[in-house]
A protein has these predicted regions:
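Residues immediately flanking
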Residues: 53, 77, 98-100
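A hydrophobic/aromatic-rich effector-binding and dimerization subdomain
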Residues: 2-25, 84-148
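Generic protein-terminus/edge-of-domain signal
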Residues: 1-68, 72, 79, 113-114, ...
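Short histidine-centered beta-strand/loop micro-motifs
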Residues: 36-42, 84-86, 106-108, 160
Length: 183
């Protein structure tokens, strides 16, 4: 089991992400020479990010990951993380911050007890950086594109589909987790 580093209350991001009954929020992050850093912080939600322009260094639980255009990042809940601009070129990313309760993390079913709760408790370690050479990359890109389209268009029932694409994303990442349970 991976033990995350100690969380300092002062580093907690105190922002409400989404609505009470639909706790997900989209963010576009832009880093420039004038504003090259997102400072170290943590929150109770997970993050799913696509780098849309440039390159950066993500620090997740004090481990550095170099990320560039097209890369996908997954940050589990309750992990310290920051972003630093890697070069003088501008950087942009699209991020969905979501609470695991959106996916059923607060229910007592097999998905919650076997997968979601262990993710939150860091008993399952999923890959944080997914690059083009990762076996799940193409599938994750398709899921991300569908998630983004649904979030923006908000057609009737979009909440159901967003939930399903987030669950699909976690399923794909679970295939490459460092701890697996037998079924």
């Amino acid at each position: 089991m991976k033990t995350p580093h100690s969380l300092i209350p002062e580093q907690k991001e105190n922002i409400k992400h989404g609505e009470v009954y639909f706790p997900i929020q989209k963010y576009i992050t832009n880093l420039t020479k004038e504003a090259p850093v997102i400072t170290m912080h943590w929150h109770e939600e997970a993050e799913l990010t696509l780098i849309t322009k440039g390159s950066c260094v993500y620090q997740i639980d004090l481990i550095e990951y170099e990320a560039s255009t097209g890369d996908i990042l997954f940050i589990p809940p309750l992990l310290l993380h920051s972003i630093i601009l890697k070069s003088s070129q501008d950087f942009c990313s699209e991020t969905y911050v979501f609470h695991m309760n959106l996916l059923g993390g607060n229910t007592a079913d097999i998905c919650s007890t076997r997968y979601l709760t262990p993710m939150v408790n860091h008993e399952l370690s999923l890959p944080c950086l997914i690059t083009a050479d990762h076996p799940a990359y193409d599938s994750l890109c398709k899921s991300f594109a569908q998630l983004a389209s649904l979030y923006d268009t908000r057609m009737f029932g979009y909440e159901l589909a967003i939930k399903s694409y987030l669950l699909q994303t976690l399923f794909l990442l679970l295939q490459y987790s460092s701890t697996r349970f037998s079924t």
